[in-house]
């Protein structure tokens, strides 16, 4: 997977953990499968822009913050 997908995944995990959320917590909030989120956080899946927007909203950050 691309470097940008890996960076996105690392950022999602970092922000999620900073906010005290487990992967399961985030997945329940987003109504998505935990295996999918695991793949996103590990850089193995590249989520759509719509999914990135949902993740940003669930984590209460901007899309820009996720992409840094």
Where are these regions (language model features)?
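Short amphipathic helical patch at the helix-1/turn junction of helix-turn-helix
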Residues: 6, 17-18, 46
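Recognition helix of helix-turn-helix/homeodomain-like DNA-binding domains
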Residues: 32-46
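DNA major-groove recognition helix of helix-turn-helix/homeodomain DNA-binding modules
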Residues: 50-65
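Short, conserved catalytic or interaction motifs in soluble domains
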Residues: 42, 61, 68
